[in-house]
Amino acid sequence: MESYKSEFIDFMVESDVLKFGDFTLKSGRKSPFFMNAGAYVTGSQLKRLGEYYAKAIHANYGDDFDVLFGPAYKGIPLAVVTAIAYHELYGKEVRYCSDRKEAKDHGADKGGFLGSKLKDGDRVVMIEDVTTSGKSMEETVPKVRGAADVTIVGLMVSLNRMEVGQGGKVSALDEIHEKYGFEGKAIVTMEEVTEYLYNREHDGRVVIDDTIKAAIDEYYKQYGCK
């Protein structure tokens, strides 16, 4: 496992972003784990988060893109901090763009987007916290492609939950690839998280013990990718 991956897993636990217990997801599924990117609230946390996203994007997509697009609302700060980190780490200037839940009807920046305008020929990397079932892309992709003649290079999420999408046959990220034609990648997968944290102590406690591991295994029997 690359060092930035293990560091990111530790970072999620330290930031109380990755939790284990009983949760109901947006998709309606009952899950033994939950990731809440909204728990990144301090300047130092956001700085580190942007760096991990930037490293993962660079490792998977290289430098051949122009815009980081973060869907509202959680994707907005993700796109901003990653654009900053990408410039600091790799010296490349990339723009950020996000959609508005409600279009602005006045001012120089009126319309359905904030940040940089999308232009014909732009190569776009989408950025989200986590994709469970792919529902979020149903609104976002048409908006981005309808704004200009752009190429969506790919989608980067922080955690690949490695479970089936809405169709119930392939993973949410594979489903997005089949439906929209671009690949989805993640900083880490849930398999990597489980393997790394199983029986490992954080602040004097084991994060994933035998009971939690059994619950995760049972969850993937029902929702895991085949």
Swiss-Prot record:
EC class of this enzyme? transferase
For this record, the Gene Ontology CC terms, alphabetical, are:
cytoplasm
E.C. no? 2.4.2.10
Q: Name one Pfam family in it.
A: Pribosyltran
Q: Which GO terms describe its biological process?
A: 'de novo' pyrimidine nucleobase biosynthetic process; 'de novo' UMP biosynthetic process; pyrimidine ribonucleoside biosynthetic process
What molecular functions are annotated in GO for this chain? magnesium ion binding; orotate phosphoribosyltransferase activity
Q: Which cofactor does it need?
A: Mg(2+)
What keywords tag this UniProt record?
Answer: Glycosyltransferase, Magnesium, Pyrimidine biosynthesis, Transferase
Its UniProt entry gives the catalysed reaction(s) as: orotidine 5'-phosphate + diphosphate = orotate + 5-phospho-alpha-D-ribose 1-diphosphate
**Domain of life, source organism:** Bacteria
Residues that coordinate or bind orotate: T132, R161
Q: In which pathway does it act?
A: Pyrimidine metabolism; UMP biosynthesis via de novo pathway; UMP from orotate: step 1/2
The entry sums up its family as follows: Belongs to the purine/pyrimidine phosphoribosyltransferase family. PyrE subfamily.
Q: How does it assemble?
A: Homodimer.
UniProt-recorded name of the protein: Orotate phosphoribosyltransferase
Q: Which organism is it from?
A: Agathobacter rectalis (strain ATCC 33656 / DSM 3377 / JCM 17463 / KCTC 5835 / VPI 0990) (Eubacterium rectale)
Recall the taxonomic lineage recorded for the source organism: Bacteria, Bacillati, Bacillota, Clostridia, Lachnospirales
Name the gene for this chain.
pyrE
